[in-house]
Amino acid sequence: MPDKAGRKMQVAIVGSGNISTDLLYKLLRSEWLEPRWMIGIDPQSEGLARARTLGLETSHEGVDWLLARDELPDMVFEATSAYVHRDAAPRYAEAGIRAIDLTPAAVGPGVIPPANLREHLDAPNVNLVTCGGQATIPMVHAVSRVVGVPYAEIVASVSSASAGPGTRANIDEFTKTTSKGVETIGGARRGKAIIILNPADPPMIMRDTIFCAIPEDADQDAITASIKEVVAQVQTYVPGYRLLNEPQFDPPSVNSGGQALVTTFVEVEGAGDYLPPYAGNLDIMTAAATKVGEEIAAKLAGASLSASSGGRS
């Protein structure tokens, strides 16, 4: 739907790689957002070529070209690298352009839609944390809103084939940013994140394991219900997100530091818009980015999309 003036938000995609191209296909379906520009640095980029055939203005001259236009976007989606976004973010802010950051730069607040999106709809720059964070932090949030979680650990296993040079170059930032998100967004007092690049061929879809320490007398039924509710919320924008089985509860043991545990297993199958379905780790980022952009546009138009955009009470 358009804004109060009857106009969709005009958006630019900065970056022309696989993630940006997949994001483009999602944005083209949006009732709230209209992709107008795609910016890259490689004139031979397949992403730029596809964008041109779909009617977008494109350039391989980077952010300088975009910001020199007579008409500027209302919003940019940046899928480059952390250091590139850190340089560009102040320029977007100076130009009055909202930014949705798909890199680990974390210039703005981290956003996981079911957990805290409503808190940050007015922020000029929001960060999508990481693919592992988008897949696992909702589950930590689901537990922590029922009981205290002194410690949470997530293990994200993704196909090696889906991990491009950007992902590999950002492994350290992935673990730091995801661990911080487990704490500040997920609600765990202490968090840890591990990523595994699975070399299996044919490629395996993204699978994640989420361990949460909980009190021994925690209400297991309430925790299970909360987990399933949040899974359903994620599925509104990532249909391929699902529980592999029921949450597993274990009593305190030496191995768990004397604490009870709930373990959740999820998998993420991509929609196959541009990326293959096994690349759920990338698809969940582009889907979450689209969700965040649409919610921002809806708020500016005085509307509300759904109840799946979390906010802590």
Curated annotation (Swiss-Prot):
Residues bound to NAD(+): 16-19, 162-170, 281
Does the UniProt entry include the keyword Nucleotide-binding? no
Q: Where is the active site?
A: 131 (acyl-thioester intermediate)
Q: Name one GO biological process term.
A: catabolic process
Question: Which UniProt keywords are listed?
Answer: Aromatic hydrocarbons catabolism, NAD, Oxidoreductase
Cite the EC number.
1.2.1.10
Which Pfam family is an annotated match for this chain, by its short name?
A: AcetDehyd-dimer
- Top enzyme class, one word, equals oxidoreductase
Q: Which domain of life is it from?
A: Bacteria
Q: Which reaction does it catalyse?
A: acetaldehyde + NAD(+) + CoA = acetyl-CoA + NADH + H(+)
Could you give a GO molecular-function term held by this entry? NAD binding
Metal-binding as a keyword of this entry, yes or no, is no
Q: Which family does it belong to?
A: Belongs to the acetaldehyde dehydrogenase family.
Return the protein name: Acetaldehyde dehydrogenase 1
